[in-house]
């Protein structure tokens, strides 16, 4: 069966918020606009200083995040055509009844264009604020149950779970034109993939490091859907695909020397780096983005880590090359089932001169990908 492939666009939800390009994003080029939702960024503030990056001259902090649901509501009334997705709001910081209501609200504002993108949460956005992050997967599954229950019940409901209790709870807000917003989720672990197959309509991997890895995880999602009586092919396969785009080997070498690019290893689990033949500079137990916590990453530890980062390790794990090379690599993921890619050029984090060209490089890669896949 021939699948439709269309890229997605990112809209940064940090200050200063720029909504000036929404007309271009609403033009039909993109499948959807994706809005990240964080309290804390993946980049340590200890190296977000002019000493390490000139990006700090534009923004005093990498953590000036806005609420993605609120930004989505604004985007909903400023656009007419393109779907709008959170990528992703977690089910730790938000009660499922509020997620259910907010999703319906934004879907009405957008006239049926909202995608509720959810995830099980991350350390940096939960632990510093006192949220219980002890059983994120169980809470995630129960949240999806509650959202679906409130949406689909015509009468007040009771629910008793491990995390949530409802007594005569109702959500009488009807869906826009009789259709509930699709739920997409980001995940890679076996249990999460099974949950997504049961409850969700779209999927992003939290990590997929080869086309075969992507295909295997997508097979798990769709297999779960089929086992639970759902149409497996109705689940949209998406991916926030991180890469390094450079016009030359010389430019790539410059990008790899940038501290914020080196710090990308914080997001890579040690077990993944071992698969590519490299030790992780933070040790064998490092779990990637799940372990990012400002409290345990002081400046001294970050600086010591940067000294240990091997550029060859980043090149082994992260796809890289010219826009055309990037497109050819990404085509392998399309052949593995990917339908909605978002090309995320991490090279833009190398500094202002690289950030200035990043969007154009991504666009060139998108154009070449669409040419390759027809």
Give the location of each predicted region.
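An alpha-helical appendage that flanks or caps ligand/catalytic pockets
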Residues: 134-172, 212-332, 372-374
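Conserved, mostly hydrophobic/aromatic
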Residues: 37, 75, 106, 147, ...
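Hydrophobic faces of well-ordered beta-strands that scaffold small-molecule active sites
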Residues: 5-9, 33-35, 84-86, 114-118, ...
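A structural motif
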Residues: 30, 110-111, 200-201, 338
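Short, acidic/polar
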Residues: 15-25, 99-102, 186-195, 322-332
